């Protein structure tokens, strides 16, 4: 990724090898502008191995969190969003079709437990960029489930090792995206799977 793995992307013009350029045929310029952040969510979902019928929680309903919601749903998962902003939760349920939006605050953990008969979620994604939220997210992972940290923070995060082992969790870090993820996003756009309302 230019600007991540190799410096020199903050310039008006640059040359790159042809194989690294993705043709955005069949998508609008507005759609093409969304490909990068959608690819980050698609990459996280691919790394998680989300399967049809699984219960997914996405903590953080910003652009990358919404991308994870979209691609988890495309794999057949039932998605719940957790965020502190009601307007974002309303958008996720209305425009993205997620099963539920839960507002961060007193009683949120009880609401999440109620949605899963107390088992919590097969896969939890954190897209908050907040160390406290990242630490709290471990509580929402079902036995045998996975916790995917999309966010990167310049801080240490801690968790209870006995609880982590008791639940036999899998912890996954997800960073950026690959060429395959960009192709996945472009195919989803061409197939009409990315809601137009996302481009606001």
Segments predicted by a language model, with ranges:
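Glycine-rich phosphate/adenylate-binding loop and adjacent beta-alpha elements
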Residues: 1-21
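Local beta-strand N-terminus motif with an aromatic residue
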Residues: 11, 53, 98, 120-121, ...
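Glycine- and other small-residue-rich loops at beta-strand/loop junctions that grip anionic moieties
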Residues: 13, 33, 57-61, 81-82, ...
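Structural detector of well-ordered beta-strand residues that form the stable sheet scaffold
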Residues: 22, 80, 146-148, 172
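Mid-domain Rossmann-like dinucleotide-binding core that forms the NAD(H)/NADP(H) cofactor-binding site
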Residues: 27-106
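Glycine-rich cofactor phosphate-binding loops and adjacent beta1-alpha1 units
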Residues: 48, 90-170
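Residues in the short beta-alpha loop(s) of Rossmann-like NAD(P)-binding domains
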Residues: 85, 153, 177
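Glycine- and charged-residue-rich phosphate/anionic-cofactor binding loop of Rossmann-like
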Residues: 172-175, 187-200
